[in-house]
């Protein structure tokens, strides 16, 4: 028995010695940190195993709890023992649908703007800005629809230039003079052709506006339409038998203006309706001669540029 005890003590001492040798060896070789790190990793492995087991237990408990709750809900559901139970469920669903329906929000009408006294300048601005309520207020208060500024431009001229047809109609109904001329002797029809509104043009012609009225330059509304390039206005004037060959103060017809300004569509339109191409202006030029003159001028410019470039290239060689 004593021998066995001694053997056990000796064996224990040997184990302790081996452990001491290992630690001292590790310290000597500078690998102590590595050994500790390995120990920690082993410790983490054992710890992670225990954590996994705990997590699995937690999940199983949660699943069990969910299944119990679901079972409870199923038990609490109303059973369809008869038709009355079914009708109750249908009524409940209908109520839910009614709750989901959104009630449309009805906007309250905005309060009408109270308009005070309208002076002359406000009246003119309203004609430009298409403010019907201000126009109506001015006229209702007895304002003169033919009042004009220092350039003799009326509210009708302004409304026509902007194409505010409703304002134009209101002013004419109130007694505005369609043939009233401004300082340059332009009528409402001239101003309409500067603005390009066909609807306003039709309204004025239907109200009896002079289709061949002349301004200070003796230009007709067709002259103005060709110069500004408003094709539909020009087409409607021609369809209403405007004078195709009317001459202005320089003797130019609408065709002369079209050629000079290179209004291709207008030129084609005038030719289609039978314009006279042989009429000469005060300079003695027909529309065709103006085209040739322009072409010759263009040729001279290009020839001059060509000669200049030739000389420059010839000089650069030396």
Swiss-Prot record:
Start and stop residues of the ANK repeats: 151-180, 184-213, 217-246, 250-279, 283-314
GO biological processes: regulation of transcription by RNA polymerase II
Pfam families in the cross-refs: Ank_2
Coiled coil: 37-77
InterPro entries: Ankyrin_rpt, Ankyrin_rpt-contain_sf
This protein's GO CC annotations: cytoplasm; nucleus
Primary location class: nucleus
Name of the gene this protein is made from: ankrd1
Location relative to the cell: Nucleus
GO function terms (MF aspect): RNA polymerase II-specific DNA-binding transcription factor binding
Superkingdom per UniProt: Eukaryota
Protein name: Ankyrin repeat domain-containing protein 1
Keyword vocabulary terms for this entry: ANK repeat, Coiled coil, Nucleus, Repeat
Role description: May act as a nuclear transcription factor that negatively regulates the expression of cardiac genes.
